[in-house]
């Protein structure tokens, strides 16, 4: 009985340690797996709208990336910083002209923010799209004119092993 209990406890610990790691996800070869999503940095310098269209074409349910907590922010900061360091990077956050609220392109709720000090400032009433700021190692956000050219980060939720 003691061995069975010990083995069961060990399996439970392994299961909990793997949960949330993306260990059971199928991300394409060159995409980062984190939590329940896959991410990829694209180096083409494009407008926010072009980046969003490109992401949608890459994978089923793909969008520009949305960031929902500090852990995800740090993971993506490290990922981008290891590959890039020159330009700000588009993410999926955009100011709705309809209601003046910042919204994620994937429709998820804006539950976490990491704006640079004094941002968003909507300079000259022309900054409706958000970037991960190169000057903060991609940890903080800035609002920018949507027609500026930047690399971008796509995200999608893959099928799990069980659903594959």
From Swiss-Prot:
Domain C-type lectin residue range list: 34-155
InterPro entries: C-type_lectin-like, C-type_lectin-like/link_sf, C-type_lectin/snaclec_domain, C-type_lectin_CS, CTDL_fold
SUPFAM superfamilies, alphabetized: C-type lectin-like (SSF56436)
Localisation per UniProt entry: Secreted
Residues glycosylated per entry: 35, 109
Record carries keyword Ribonucleoprotein: no
Residue span of motif Mannose-binding: 119-121
Pfam families recorded: Lectin_C
Segment forming the signal sequence: 1-23
Primary localization class, coarse: secreted
Cellular component per GO, a single term: extracellular region
Tissues and organs where the protein is expressed, per its UniProt entry: Expressed by the venom gland.
Sorted UniProt keywords: Calcium, Disulfide bond, Glycoprotein, Lectin, Metal-binding, Secreted, Signal
Disulfide pairings: 27-38, 55-154, 129-146
Binding sites annotated in the UniProt record for Ca(2+): 127, 142-143
GO terms assigned for molecular function: carbohydrate binding; metal ion binding
The keyword Secreted is assigned to this record: yes
Biological role: Mannose-binding lectin which recognizes specific carbohydrate structures and agglutinates a variety of animal cells by binding to cell-surface glycoproteins and glycolipids. May be a calcium-dependent lectin.
Similarity comment: family membership: Belongs to the true venom lectin family.
Protein name listed in UniProt: C-type lectin 1
């Amino acid at each position: 009985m003691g061995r069975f209990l010990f083995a069961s406890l060990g399996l439970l610990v392994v299961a909990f340690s793997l949960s949330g790691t993306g260990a059971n996800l199928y991300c394409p070869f060159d995409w980062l797996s984190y939590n329940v999503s896959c991410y990829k940095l694209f180096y083409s310098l494009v407008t926010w709208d072009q980046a969003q269209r490109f992401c949608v074409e890459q994978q089923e349910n793909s969008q520009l990336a949305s960031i929902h907590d500090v852990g995800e922010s740090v993971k993506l900061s490290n990922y981008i910083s290891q590959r890039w360091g020159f330009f700000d990077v588009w993410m999926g956050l955009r100011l709705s002209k309809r209601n003046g609220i910042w919204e994620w392109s994937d429709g998820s709720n804006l539950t976490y923010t990491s704006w640079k000090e004094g941002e968003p400032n909507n300079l000259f009433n022309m900054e409706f799209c958000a970037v991960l700021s190169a000057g903060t190692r991609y940890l903080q956000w800035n609002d920018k004119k949507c027609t500026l050219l930047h690399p971008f980060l796509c995200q999608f939720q893959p099928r799990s092993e069980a659903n594959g």
